[in-house]
Amino acid sequence: MGCLGNQLLIAILLLSVYGIYCIQYVTVFYGVPAWRNATIPLFCATKNRDTWGTTQCLPDNDDYSELALNVTESFDAWENTVTEQAIEDVWQLFETSIKPCVKLSPLCITMRCNKSETDKWGLTKSSTTTASTTTTTTAKSVETRDIVNETSPCVVHDNCTGLEQEPMISCKFNMTGLKRDKKKEYNETWYSADLVCEQGNSTGNESRCYMNHCNTSVIQECCDKDYWDAIRCRYCAPPGYALLRCNDTNYSGFMPNCSKVVVSSCTRMMETQTSTWFRFNGTRAENRTYIYWHGRDNRTIISLNKHYNLTMKCRRPGNKTVLPVTIMSALVFHSQPVNERPKQAWCRFGGNWKEAIKEVKQTIVKHPRYTGTNNTDKINLTAPRGGDPEVTFMWTNCRGEFLYCKMNWFLNWVEDRSLTTQKPKERHKRNYVPCHIRQIINTWHKVGKNVYLPPREGDLTCNSTVTSLIANINWTDGNQTSITMSAEVAELYRLELGDYKLVEITPIGLAPTNVKRYTTGGTSRNKRGVFVLGFLGFLATAGSAMGAASLTVTAQSRTLLAGIVQQQQQLLDVVKRQQELLRLTVWGTKNLQTRVSAIEKYLKDQAQLNAWGCAFRQVCHTTVPWPNASLTPDWNNETWQEWERKVDFLEANITALLEEAQIQQEKNMYELQKLNSWDVFGNWFDLTSWIKYIQYGIYIIVGVILLRIVIYIVQMLARLRQGYRPVFSSPPSYFQXTHTQQDPALPTKEGKKGDGGGSGGNSSWPWQIEYIHFLIRQLIRLLTWLFSNCRTLLSRAYQILQPIFQRLSATLRRIREVLRLELTYLQYGWSYFQEAVQAAQRSATETLAGAWGELWEALQRGGRWILAIPRRIRQGLELTLL
């Protein structure tokens, strides 16, 4: 029985210790290096100082560094808010640069165009004769291969084989102008591709023609004579956010576990050039060919090897003039009178294109997504068929003019195709292609929207570096594979920015610790200033273990706050400098929105900390128990980012518990503050407290009355139970009748135990008093038992620990003796070493002194011998003469 009692006592003590020290409580950390995906708007920065580019982006200062992180993150170029924003924003730049505001629907009327010109350029049926003649003539020609370079004469004079005149048609039309009640005749010049003419409905020398897009959409013209021109810009994250980049060379547009991650506040520079088929002047070209392949279809972006130096040089020859014609109020149409027939625009390709395309095919064969033929001879580069002109032609911009280039000659040259199945005009292998210009173009971003672009004056030339191509790769079962060039302009920006992802910094972390709120004393304030590494330095510990990162959480939180404030201030400064230019523009509103978002994020974090009672505290202990005892962090091997992913499902529950605990604590503090009012003696006589005093008095009176009633009922029950044994007790060993003599004169009367109360002279004390005595004795016995067991437990523990302490003490004494002996040996050895050194020094000194003395004597003897030589010679001569 005693052993069982000891075990029970030990179990109770262990449970008490566990309850005190092993319960985990929620601890709030502010400044942890963790993040989550975000979709907040980015802002752009650029160095371009032209008017429209400056109004769209903030000035760029090149102060953007990258920091490597020891983390693993997933990246996707297609499901990516950075690329989606770039696609949308480049379109906004394009739309803002041309500023469409005037509807050209009044020009959707019948125009009388020069019939000879419409016949020549194939807009009427009469062109059949011309076309057939041309076909007959060309059919007799043989396959030609024309390769030109910078020094070729035709390049200088813009008269290379196959290039023609620019197809332009002059037209007349009548419409009401500034005077609405009178019609006026206007003369305009159109590109043939912008017109459609009625067939067989010509009168005399005129053909009936209309604008090409009148029946499909609303066409708008520029208000100002501005031109779309590409700029270089970069995207930057708002304060409180960051951009992660996958730095792995094997990244191909999708990687769930990229281990080479860097963080930055801004992206690399990006070119806003818009074109189909090719990407010009990109920033992702390397000394290798690599492919971004969409995860669910065959859309690809192929980055070309910059080693091959692939270029494209386009030119629109001629000295074109532009004449603004006011057609009606608020409608200025930019006409181009034909002073002399302009030559056709054209583009020339330079570099080792054949080897570059060959390497592209080899890279496709090696790609894990590709399952077609491995024979590169069966992989062909093809042009898309059908669709808008922007699809079938290579569409690009050259200093404001949009060129539509027919690429058959180029594909024949690169692929070295057989030309027997092609049309006569296409039966050539050339490294240049003819292009035509349109003023009414289909926008690449929104289907069915057309924009009129006024022609540009003068001779236009533009040189570009080809860095990638957009294509759809399709193959059959081991037979043929086609690399079909694509018009998905949006894919260009997936290659440029697809290795970035936008994340929101989540500096608030929740983790279990053994510390409960208000159980530890406050730490002393560190007076030394913290070296602020900048906002990116805050994420430097993202790959560190939670324990190491939490040790520097104070400095990290200060760095985080300083970085946010610094970025906000810089952003505000540049916005202020651009205040006038940013007015009423989409990008200006977007830039201001990023600043507001950053402030909202910081205030949101502080409001959340305040709701938990942790405002402006880096490490905040709480009284909320950790809800999942089996889920604890590995402080030495687990990062905060990994831990945040594991406890994401608990965040809502923990947040609610923290708020409830803070509300309860505030209530307790309120009650405590109410009690503090009694500290001042004068408050006791406050008039507002008199009503409370009256209430307390009434409560006391009612309590006294109730107590009297209870005492009366107890006394009544006691009288009724007098003389009876308690029904809930065993035979009362504690009950002993105490005989008393009521009257000494009366004889003693023996009464039986258990008899009812009588009027005899003998009676027993009430059993309740004896029962109380019994309880007291049992309590004393229990306390004695507890004391004896505790003493026994302590004595046994002492007996167990005493030998251990004795052995430990003996071991320490032996270690001390050994150390003292070793120290003595070392001291003796050191003294012996010192004596040896001194003896060696003395011996060396004596030896050197003796050697120096002998050397000095030898030198003296030699010197005397040398000095004596003349004297000996003289003495010898004297002896000889004698």
From Swiss-Prot:
UniProt-annotated stretches for the region Immunosuppression: 592-608
MPER as annotated region, ranges: 674-695
Region (Disordered): 738-761
Gene Ontology BP annotations: membrane fusion involved in viral entry into host cell; symbiont entry into host cell; virion attachment to host cell
Cellular component, GO, one term: host cell endosome membrane
Site (Cleavage): 528-529
Motif extent (Di-leucine internalization motif): 881-882
Matching InterPro entries: Gp120_core_sf (IPR036377), GP41-like (IPR000328), HIV1_Gp120 (IPR000777)
Region (V5): 478-485
Keywords noted in UniProt: Apoptosis, Cleavage on pair of basic residues, Coiled coil, Disulfide bond, Fusion of virus membrane with host membrane, Glycoprotein, Host cell membrane, Host endosome, Host membrane, Host-virus interaction, Lipoprotein, Membrane, Palmitate, Signal, Transmembrane, Transmembrane helix, Viral attachment to host cell, Viral envelope protein, Viral penetration into host cytoplasm, Virion, Virus entry into host cell
Coiled coil: 637-669
Single GO term (MF): structural molecule activity
Site (In-frame UAG termination codon): 737
Bilayer-spanning residue ranges: 698-718
Additional remarks: This is a macaque isolate.
Domain notes: Some of the most genetically diverse regions of the viral genome are present in Env. They are called variable regions 1 through 5 (V1 through V5). The 17 amino acids long immunosuppressive region is present in many retroviral envelope proteins. Synthetic peptides derived from this relatively conserved sequence inhibit immune function in vitro and in vivo.
Role played: The surface protein gp120 (SU) attaches the virus to the host lymphoid cell by binding to the primary receptor CD4. This interaction induces a structural rearrangement creating a high affinity binding site for a chemokine coreceptor like CCR5. This peculiar 2 stage receptor-interaction strategy allows gp120 to maintain the highly conserved coreceptor-binding site in a cryptic conformation, protected from neutralizing antibodies. These changes are transmitted to the transmembrane protein gp41 and are thought to activate its fusogenic potential by unmasking its fusion peptide. Surface protein gp120 (SU) may target the virus to gut-associated lymphoid tissue (GALT) by binding host ITGA4/ITGB7 (alpha-4/beta-7 integrins), a complex that mediates T-cell migration to the GALT. Interaction between gp120 and ITGA4/ITGB7 would allow the virus to enter GALT early in the infection, infecting and killing most of GALT's resting CD4+ T-cells. This T-cell depletion is believed to be the major insult to the host immune system leading to AIDS.
The protein, known as: Envelope glycoprotein gp160
Source organism of the structure: Simian immunodeficiency virus (isolate Mm142-83) (SIV-mac)
Lineage of producing organism: Viruses, Riboviria, Pararnavirae, Artverviricota, Revtraviricetes
Encoding gene (name): env
